[in-house]
Amino acid sequence: MPKGGIIGLLTTLAVTAQFASGQLEPDCNPLKADCQPKKALPNENYYIDFTKQTSPPQDWIIANDEAVNFTSNGAEFAYAKEGDAPSMWTGFYMLGGRYDIEMKIAPGQGVISSAALWSDTQDEIDYEFSGNQFGQTPFPPQDGMWAIETNVFAQGKMWDGAATYQKDSYKPAEQFHKYSVEWDEDHMNWYVDDKVVRSIQAKDTPSGFTFPQSPMKLQLGVWGGGDPSNSYWTKQWAGGEIDLTGAPYTMYVKSVSITNKYPACQYRYNDKWAK
């Protein structure tokens, strides 16, 4: 991961909870334009317990026109009607470290729960879960047959995706589990309940792609892959069309814990090094 020409250590800016328009998208892509510096996480460790929140935390941003509720169950992301896509993301970026998310996925055919690291240059490292196992049968699957989808994007291009299967008793829509991503300039690891389920080394990056190497936010949310208005293939991937009579379908996040490998105050792109 390039160190020079990417990080500018400036002053930390206060960011309050706010509502932004749409899904998480860059307001400025530094590969295409000169962009303002972005807030970084200045501390080595960060932890938030959503079960103790009663309103949006000041360092998280909630998508405009969507609702995320905070109760004793944690942050609640409810798919209640066609087009719902409640999500929120950190108001700060990181350039490497470990992210631990304690969550319970939303049930429901075609309902997608996600936890993703996402950058302004459209690098992405994610988890995606289908409430009905992406349409696989029989459902619910036997122990050892639950699949979790993990994906990697580099500058908006998907270069790796795979399903990992849980070997133990695993009921993700009924139980809370800890899902973790560890990422730096050398590797990416995905964990479930502190067990490595997948690993990628930077040296194995395929030709024509770059290893994710830009500061990222953490985004959490649920959306309707099986929305009736979606394309046939999107609905097929998600596990089929959503039964709206069974809504709402809710994903819960109890807590987020972060270990920050490179504490900083702000990130600045001094050139378009990633092009």
Describe every region a protein language model picked out.
Residues F19-S180, D186-N189, K195-K275:
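GH16 jelly-roll
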Residues M1-P26:
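Fungal secretory targeting signals
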